[in-house]
Design a protein with these regions (language model features):
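Conserved AAA+ ATPase small/helical "lid" subdomain
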Residues: 222-277
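Non-catalytic, well-ordered alpha-helical scaffold segments
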Residues: 23, 145, 186, 190, ...
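Contiguous, well-ordered alpha-helical segments that form the cores/surfaces of helical PPI scaffolds
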Residues: 22-31, 275-286
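Alpha-helix N-cap/helix-initiation sites
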Residues: 18, 204, 252-253, 269-275, ...
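C-terminal engagement/docking regions of AAA+ P-loop ATPases
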Residues: 46-49, 260-272, 283-337
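Conserved AAA+ ATPase core "coupling" helix
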Residues: 100-103, 184-242
């Protein structure tokens, strides 16, 4: 019988296509410092399904028992009773308020000397896990800022009437949306580490296969999980091994220089593009169980890291992916295209 307990989530290993989205998610799990991923694409293309499937695939974490912040007991001076739980996968509803997201300070309890002085929000629940925001492009800009700040710093600070409470909020931020419903402001979009684009699969035979697999899974989920259990375990093992080996991955100075040359060639503002492109290439190298970044690692990841950072010119006839590919060929392959 399958060791993956949540039979309501489609197995990650069984998801057909959408390789760009799957790669971006896996690399962020390997190195959360990449900075999250924005997934833009058509409705009904498996965005939510894939994110839930990945969270279910990952190994359990150890926390202090019944702790609302999912605190890691390692390294603490005091010993606590612990429990193993699935990695948190928290979905943020579109109409959420700042109090619902960040938590609330109970002034009456504080003045009365009580213990329940803080009501944790969604950021507390997401600590050491994944925070998913569907239709993030429709979310209030201020709330998006709050999420990005917490994801980058690893902390959530709540202040009210001169009282401040701070707690860990280390999570991978995943946003998704349909570009037809509007884009995020460039200033916010730039703060996401990666940007994956997905499209509806057009090949009829592949569409039929996807439909059949989904219907079969809904009918007999246990059989389906048993069928893919070995592949699930292999992916899980590769991710865990990559996390352990990430610190030992090397990238040559020449490759680092060329990554920066591409960013300069594309007139990308700031250094986030350089940093994330390097981190993503190293994460992919670790995932492939190698010790040194190759040209292919950079080629597979650089578009994910840079496409949302390009200046938008409505008069251009090529898309962002093609533009990055041309810059890659020019600088890495010495092509005069």
């Amino acid at each position: 019988m399958s060791t993956f307990k949540n039979l309501t989530n489609f197995p990650f290993a069984a998801i057909i296509g959408q390789e760009e989205m799957k790669l971006a998610l896996q690399l962020n799990v390997i190195d959360p410092k990449i900075g999250g991923v924005m997934i833009m694409g058509d409705r009904g293309t498996g965005k939510s399904t894939t994110i839930r499937a990945l969270a279910d695939l990952l190994p359990d974490i150890t926390i202090i028992k019944n702790d609302p912040f999912n605190t890691d007991p390692k390294g603490l001076a005091k010993e606590y009773e612990t429990e193993n739980v699935k990695i948190p996968m928290v979905e943020l509803p579109l109409g959420s308020t700042e109090d619902r997201v960040c938590g609330t300070i109970n002034l009456k309890e504080i003045l009365a000397g009580g213990n329940n002085t803080f009501e944790p929000g969604l950021l507390a629940r997401a600590n050491r896990g994944i925070l998913y925001v569907d239709e993030i492009n429709l979310l209030d800009d201020h709330l998006v800022d709050v999420l990005l700040d917490s994801a980058a710093s690893g902390w959530n600070t709540v202040e009210r009437e001169g009282i401040s409470i701070k707690h860990p909020a280390k999570f991978i931020l995943v946003g998704s949306g349909n570009p037809e419903e509007g884009e995020l402001r460039p200033q916010l979009l730039d703060r996401f580490g990666m940007h994956a684009e997905i499209r509806t699969i057009r090949e009829p035979k592949l569409r039929v296969k996807i439909v059949e697999e989904r219907i079969n899974f809904d009918s007999t989920p246990q059989v389906w999980f048993d069928k893919y259990e070995q592949e699930q375990l292999e992916i899980q093992s590769r991710i865990v091994t990559a996390q352990k080996n990430l610190g030992a991955i090397e990238i040559s100075k020449d490759f680092q220089l060329k990554i920066s040359q591409i960013c300069s060639e594309l007139e990308i503002e700031g250094l986030r593009g350089d940093i994330v492109s390097t981190r993503a290439a190293k994460a992919l190298t670790a995932f492939e169980n190698r010790s040194e970044v190759t040209l292919e690692d950079i080629k597979r990841t650089i578009t994910l890291c840079l496409r949302h950072r390009l200046r938008r010119d409505p008069m251009e006839s090529i898309n962002s992916g093609e533009k990055i590919d041309l810059a890659f060929q020019k600088i890495f392959l010495n092509s005069n295209i």
